[in-house]
Amino acid sequence: MDPYKHRPSSGSNSSFWTTNSGAPVWNNNSALTVGQRGPILLEDYHLIEKLAQFDRERIPERVVHARGASAKGFFEVTHDVSHLTCADFLRAPGVQTPVIVRFSTVVHERGSPETLRDPRGFAVKFYTREGNFDLVGNNMPVFFIRDGMKFPDMVHAFKPNPKTNLQENWRIVDFFSHHPESLHMFTFLFDDVGIPLNYRHMEGFGVNTYSLINRDGKPHLVKFHWKPTCGVKCLLDNEAVTVGGTCHSHATKDLYDSIAAGNYPEWKLYIQTIDLDHEDKFDFDPLDVTKTWPEDIIPLQPVGRMVLNKNVDNFFAENEQIAFCPAISVPAIHYSDDKLLQTRIFSYADTQRHRLGPNYLMLPVNAPKCAHHNNHHDGFMNFMHRDEEVNYFPSRFDPARHAEKVPIPPRVLTRCREKCIIQKENNFKQAGERYRSFDPARQDRFIQRWVDALTHPRVTHEHRTIWISYWSQCDAALGQKLPSRLNLKPSM
């Protein structure tokens, strides 16, 4: 064994206790002292090392998606999509790719109950032959905002009050009263699907718009959808209180126990695609992350299935240290000009470097399974064994060359630089359509959740008037019922 290439793991455990450097430890129960009752000696290196390691076990918590659980499995192509993309892992039916998935809540801290009303993260890392592909989404198909400039403020509004350290509805109501594009997302969050039964019984969505490119270089805008084969199930508010009071990690436990018992969760992957020549034919902007693409106009197309059949071996290594980023893609799956996606491309990688260090992609759970080569050297916690003499490019001493170019069609950009909003905001139509799709009992529960939010003592009459105006523009009947329950007169 080459000791310079050896990576410590549980597979190399010795039969006796050692220090981190491998020295034998003959007593792991007592500190080194002067006699039986004397002071502890600083020279007890094993004690110092043990305490220092313990003091540094925790790493910075994720700003969002702190509470989560991961599982491993595979993705298998079931339908031919080669006419849409030449991505290698989608090349033909039957092709399988290893994956790891992390499910999560979004706003709340690492130890919070998994029964809180909150979006759920649904992030998939594909270990393909052309590098990793991170499809980083949620269990809801839309988002609160369409421009990443607002993201830090939005998260601050959802997070606890910096003075009281309490999450308070008045802050959420106040912030989003300035952002009517959030209404569609709230028809999901304040709907029954706002609290999934567990991770196995929820959908997943790529949320953002991406671009697929085929061998001829023709692009299509695309959205990704995960559908659970066991169906979608949710918890009502009173059920969530009961479940959360019994086990605050119920979703993590359910996922782990199901896989351990051989009841492997499975999702079908579907896509929706739009030809770039048709993107102006709708009453919404296909790059607007606050909108869904109507399935009666843009039907779902089956692609494959994902099965999770293995639990993680170590929660910290494969759940806390796993890092996702929408920028991590593969040839023939490209970004679109979706404003939120464009900002996520930077922000996700940046937060991982803060949380895990500049070499976070070397961690086994994040590293590609395929061969890879570059001149990204050194930095904190770089544990890659390298012995080459040439660390620049190009060189006649290094045979590495440029990869084959992916056929990404050029786009001519000629407009003026400006900070602006999109033209087709259309903030109310889809929110109203979704509300009207609810049965009466479901509508009533939706209204009651808004009544609860708008009756917070810090919510002002102006706030209530604005929200009633918004919901009235979504649905006239909703605009009448909400003020009636609030004992207010509707503004329109």
UniProtKB/Swiss-Prot annotation:
This is Catalase isozyme 1. Heme binds at Y348. Occurs in almost all aerobically respiring organisms and serves to protect cells from the toxic effects of hydrogen peroxide. GO terms for cellular component: cytoplasm; peroxisome; plasma membrane. Keywords: Heme, Hydrogen peroxide, Iron, Metal-binding, Oxidoreductase, Peroxidase, Peroxisome. It is found in: Peroxisome. GO terms for molecular function: catalase activity; heme binding; metal ion binding. Its main location: other. Changing S211T: In strain: cv. W64A. PROSITE patterns: CATALASE_1 (PS00437), CATALASE_2 (PS00438), CATALASE_3 (PS51402). The gene is CAT1. It comes from Zea mays. Pfam families: Catalase, Catalase-rel. Scutella, milky endosperm of immature kernels, leaves and epicotyls. SUPFAM superfamilies: Heme-dependent catalase-like. The active site is at H65, N138. It is an enzyme of class 1 (oxidoreductase).
